[in-house]
A protein has these predicted regions:
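PLP-dependent aminotransferase-like
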Residues: 1, 87-146
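PLP-dependent aminotransferase class I/II
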Residues: 31-32, 201-252
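N-terminal "arm"/small-domain region of PLP-dependent enzymes with the aminotransferase-like
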Residues: 1-48, 140, 174
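Active-site pre-lysine segment of PLP-dependent enzymes
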Residues: 126-140, 152-211
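Short glycine-rich anion-binding loops that position phosphate/pyrophosphate groups of nucleotides
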Residues: 25-28, 78-79, 148-152, 183, ...
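Phosphate-binding glycine-rich loop
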Residues: 54-94
């Protein structure tokens, strides 16, 4: 078999045998009609290379997120940006939650990073609490990976706690990678993007996959005020990594 390891994710409807899949939590309403139409309109342009800088898409995201366009880097899905971030930084030490999304650890493993895990407990409803702060003090990581809401527990991290974590990172010269890919599907979730300008050590991950039912398109983006980091990530990624159809879908 070509692939040496088993796929760790759900959503593999192609091998047969899946009746109900609770792991692929995309928008149950499906892909918006306007996105489907934008993809159809883009088909005649397939003979051309896609825009390597995603210019129209970046401007559309900047308007939607109300952040400067210079804060935005697009990628071939959220997972692509996780691996690009790890490749650009090549941290020696990192922390993540347990349980959480497996691709953080996989991306860090590819660059030989030592990962420490902060375990969440059912007795506390799997909530992240202020006990994470002394854990950071003890482990002194170069980067912390958090997911808000956490995947797979679905629990939100309060914004005041995120601010405390960022204060620690700023004081210690560490970074915070914050995955907000599921945030739009929550009722009470508050994005940390208001903290970007004051905290260049913060990078927020977003994707079209969940909110817009676009898992097959592969389109994600990140927000960060550290332009030097975004340039390093762009240099670590492959050219033309966001297809023209994905860009058209994202603009729509």
């Amino acid at each position: 078999m070509l692939y040496q390891t088993e796929n760790q994710h759900g959503g593999d409807v192609y091998g047969g045998g899946i009746t109900l899949d609770f792991s692929a939590n995309t928008n149950p309403l499906g892909t918006p009609p306007g996105v489907l139409e934008a993809v159809r309109r883009g088909l005649p342009q397939l003979h051309r290379y896609p825009d390597p800088y995603c210019r129209r898409l970046v401007q559309a995201i900047a308007t939607h997120e109300q952040v400067p366009a210079s804060y935005i880097l697009c990628g071939n899905g959220a997972a692509d940006l996780i691996y690009t971030y790890c490749a650009a930084l090549r941290p020696r030490t990192a922390v993540e939650l347990a349980p959480t999304f497996v691709e953080y650890g996989a991306g860090l493993a590819q660059v030989g990073c030592r990962v420490e895990r902060y375990f969440l407990h059912q007795a506390q409803n799997f909530d992240l609490d202020e006990g994470f702060l002394p854990f950071l003090e003890e482990k002194k990581p170069e980067v912390a990976f958090l997911c808000n809401p956490n995947n797979p527990t679905g629990r939100l991290i309060p914004l005041p706690l995120l601010e405390q974590i960022l204060q620690y990172c700023a004081a210690q010269g560490a970074r915070l990678f914050l995955d907000e890919c599921f945030l739009d599907l929550t009722e009470d979730g508050v994005s940390a993007k208001s903290l970007l300008a004051a905290h260049p050590e913060l990078l927020i991950l977003k994707a079209f996959t969940k909110s817009y039912g676009m898992a097959g398109i592969r389109l994600g983006y990140c927000l960060c005020a550290d332009s030097a980091l975004l340039r390093r990530m762009a240099s670590a990624s492959q050219p033309w990594n966001v297809s023209s159809l994905a860009q058209s879908a994202g603009v729509a």
